């Protein structure tokens, strides 16, 4: 309902729109409209009000609010339901709890900051307030658990396609890091809940460094992390970029369900910087175990095929560094 109010205010531009008009559109009282406007103001919207004239939107906050993100989103699955958190330890944790209690497929959990964001191999993920897009999406795909890695690759392609829309060239390092000049911009963590032969739900967590300056990164990350604004030369609208990512996720998830993985795999290969390179692979199950070889292909399941000691070895999970 607040999304509709914001949309009406934005469509009115510099004109005021009466409380009566808003009430009629929504089928509620003018008092209820006033209460919604007050809540929007609490969320950071600057809304002017004038007796006998109504309301006018003067400024919208740079926050990842559903009332902002869902305007013009027009997705079929992803982002129809959104859970907004000003601050949370981990969006994946919240999303898993919501999924366990029956949240709809496509539900998004998004936060302004994460205080305990996690990456692969239980690493911390730097997620400062208002500087990036930290979110998780709940999926309930009708696939076997062995096919779950395809969703990680799909998510990487979705973010890469969104970057293309903003004229930023993406580079994907298997399985799910998006890089620029050897520095990480995007991380993806996929967590599966289910049985041996059936997936109950999958939570795909995505962290995107949007408007973080080099100086704002912790010193230990400055040489290995980057942000979209650093590449672009100016700050990006987090709302617009997030909306673009959700649209790409929606399109690719539907494509995966209806047409399979082949074309998504082709697009992943187009963006990849791993194949043909010498790599070091760290096992997801035992970080003390690693091996080196040459990344030669991705198989149909999304596993990285590495030539090592004269044999081909398929890697389904782990961490890869390019040598």
Where are these regions (language model features)?
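Structural motif
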Residues: 81-82, 106-108, 133, 171, ...
């Amino acid at each position: 309902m607040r999304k509709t109010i914001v949309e009406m205010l934005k469509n009115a531009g510099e004109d005021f729109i009466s409380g009566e008009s808003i009430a009629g559109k929504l089928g509620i009282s003018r008092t209820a409209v006033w209460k919604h406007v007050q809540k929007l103001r609490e969320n950071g919207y600057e809304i002017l009000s004038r007796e006998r004239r109504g309301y006018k939107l003067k400024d919208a906050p740079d926050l990842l609010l559903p009332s902002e993100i869902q305007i013009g989103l027009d997705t079929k699955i992803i982002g129809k339901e959104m859970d907004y958190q000003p601050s949370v330890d981990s969006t994946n944790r919240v999303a898993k709890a919501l999924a366990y209690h029956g949240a709809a497929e496509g539900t998004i959990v998004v936060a302004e900051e994460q205080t305990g964001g996690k990456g692969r191999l239980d690493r911390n993920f730097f997620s400062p307030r208002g500087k990036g897009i930290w979110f998780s999406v709940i999926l309930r795909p009708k696939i076997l658990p062995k096919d779950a890695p395809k969703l990680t690759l799909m998510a990487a392609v979705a973010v890469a396609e969104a970057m293309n829309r903003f004229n930023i060239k993406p580079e994907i390092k298997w399985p799910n890091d998006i890089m620029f000049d050897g520095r990480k911009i995007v991380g993806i963590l996929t967590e599966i809940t289910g049985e041996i032969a059936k997936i109950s739900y999958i939570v795909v967590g995505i962290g995107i460094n949007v408007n973080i300056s080099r100086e704002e990164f912790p010193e230990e990350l400055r040489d290995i992390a980057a942000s979209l604004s650093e590449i672009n030369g100016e700050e990006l609208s987090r709302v617009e970029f997030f909306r673009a990512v959700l649209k790409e996720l929606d399109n690719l998830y539907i494509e995966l369900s209806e047409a399979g993985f082949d074309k998504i795999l082709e697009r992943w290969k187009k963006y990849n910087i791993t194949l043909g390179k010498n790599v070091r692979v760290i096992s997801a199950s035992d970080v003390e175990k690693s091996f080196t070889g040459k990344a030669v292909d991705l198989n149909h399941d999304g596993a990285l095929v590495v030539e090592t000691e004269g044999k081909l070895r398929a890697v389904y999970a782990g961490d890869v560094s390019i040598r």
